[in-house]
Amino acid sequence: RDDVESRGLGDVYKRQALLYNTLDGKYIKTCNLKIIQILKEILCEKNCGVVLLPQHIYDDIEIKTFINELQSKFMGDIIEVSLSEGKPVQILPYLNYKDLHKNKHQFSSLENLLQTLCEITIYLDNTVNIKTLIEYLRSFSLNLTYNIIGDWKDIPHGSLLIDYLGQMSYSNYIQCSYTHIPLLESSLKKNFSYQVYVSLPVDHSLMNNTCIFLDQQKIPFQYIFQVTSLEDCNEAVTLIEKYDIDKYQLRPLYTKDNISFLAKNTFLTEEDILSTKISMKDIFRKHIINKDNFGKLFILSNGDIYANILHKKLGNIKTDSIYQIVKKEIEIGESWLRIRNQKPCCDCLYQYICPSPSDLDLMIGQLNLCTVNNK
């Protein structure tokens, strides 16, 4: 008789099981009920990652083949019972905050709740009160990532905000259209970068001027091409090659009538999901938080604050402290803790291997932007 142990992360859903090695991304997927039963026993906390394997079960060719694969992928092993004085113990990774989404006060009791905050996006137009905004930012004085949307040069005291952020943070981004790029003072360039959004088709004269302008600024920049069709993708590739653009993204947009384009080009397949190596920390992180949204806030020009523009507002800079805003989002918000705990994702083998739910999911109104459970 032998003891069998597993060193991979394992999940069992109904009649399927997945073992995943977070060190190299290798995996074993099985629908064999005999193997699934063994895995269930291994994953049971009281068994401490090790179960007894009687000889008659080990002699089963399917079980033996599985164990050989387990060993070859360094995801588990078998140990002769006679070589051990007692049952071996293996510490399996378990999530400490299993009921976090039921007991969100566990998050709110953090010694410094504001440590969860990492990024603020600020929208500017001629209605914004810059002095009130700066006063609000000073109330917590954290070294965060700041994104600025809008041209501060047309706003009274707008330059005060840019000066303040230049002193407060080394990670500031000017998000703007390629048709209008605000000019930064030379003294601030080291603490700012441009994120230039390109809607297609482009005005080629403006695009040419923008590329020349950015090359002259000696400041980091990235182009974000907003694509809604295959034609947009082709044009983006043409522009990238023409202007020798190194840093760029192709970001899909939903227009209500391009779902077939998105389904064909952005929906994940099973192969896509398993092609990227994911760390154990990332997998457990996605049990608790939305990796794309957690820690991010948006401040509109009227002072309203959101965790996600597609969700309800959390408050306003004139009436709510940043602590109240963060606490509210954690306790009753819809964005930071939005995970794949709803159907069909909660019944899927890849629930926490998949990326966190995205804004595209919200806009389309479909949680599973994949082909795994849509067959």
Question: Where are the predicted features?
Answer:
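Single conserved hydrophobic/aromatic residue that forms the stacking wall/gate
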Residues: 2-13
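Iron-sulfur (Fe-S) cluster-binding segments and ferredoxin-like electron-carrier domains
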Residues: 312, 351-375
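Long, charge-rich, low-complexity alpha-helical segments
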Residues: 29-125, 129-145, 159-164, 347
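A C-terminal junction/extension of Radical SAM enzymes
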Residues: 234-308, 351-353
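Core AdoMet radical
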Residues: 113-128, 137-157, 165-184, 191-205, ...
